[in-house]
């Protein structure tokens, strides 16, 4: 509900207008590829400038790893729910079962993506680094990192005596993550999509 209210207020506050389903498809494509995260609006792959004044696509790649890693983990949880409630199959599942494969790949991608984003933020020039927001950024990145990392550790230790303690730590991080999710840096993805949707609609209206 918090996501919906925030997104609706943002949409109205910017004066954006619905551009139709073709514009929606354009915005979805831009979101999936993150082509705008390439240094300019053309998405030509120039990359974003780093502290050494050289352009790099590292931020786009780490965003990709984080976004798709999260989606794979979400798919893993959804698949596990279907297995449990619809198919009557209780966890733990085999290492080659779909929920485990999706969660493992997604967890690794999340670890790589969040660690990379943290590295990129550390390398940013102080003049362009929003110091007032770094606390929120770092907190979100590290919580997401440890959620995925403890999930991978849980998988590795699930047949040992440490499984119970690891599960408690992992679930505690997961619950905390979802509790603060509507008020964290995560929402910038929704606002970014809203901006892309408004831009796609405006572009199509201008082309008519």
Predicted regions and their residues:
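Membrane-embedded alpha-helical bundles of multi-pass integral membrane proteins
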Residues: 1-208
């Amino acid at each position: 509900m918090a996501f919906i209210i925030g997104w609706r207020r943002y949409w109205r506050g910017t004066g954006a207008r619905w551009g139709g389903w073709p514009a929606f498809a354009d915005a979805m494509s831009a979101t999936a590829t993150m082509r705008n995260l390439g240094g300019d609006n053309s998405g030509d792959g120039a990359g974003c400038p780093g502290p050494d004044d050289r352009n790099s696509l590292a931020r786009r790649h780490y965003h990709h790893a984080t976004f798709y890693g999260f989606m794979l983990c979400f798919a893993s949880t959804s698949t596990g729910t279907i297995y449990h409630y619809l198919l009557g199959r209780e966890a733990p599942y085999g290492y080659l079962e779909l929920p485990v494969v999706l969660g493992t790949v997604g967890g690794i991608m999340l670890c790589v993506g969040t660690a990379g984003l943290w590295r990129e933020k550390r390398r940013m020039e102080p003049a362009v680094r929003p110091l007032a927001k770094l606390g929120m950024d770092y907190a979100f990145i590290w919580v997401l990192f440890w959620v995925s990392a403890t999930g991978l550790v849980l998988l590795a230790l699930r047949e040992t005596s440490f499984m119970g303690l690891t599960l408690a730590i992992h679930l505690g991080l997961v619950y905390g993550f979802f509790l603060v999710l509507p008020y964290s840096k995560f929402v910038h993805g929704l606002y970014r999509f809203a901006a892309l949707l408004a831009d796609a609609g405006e572009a199509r209206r201008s082309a008519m």
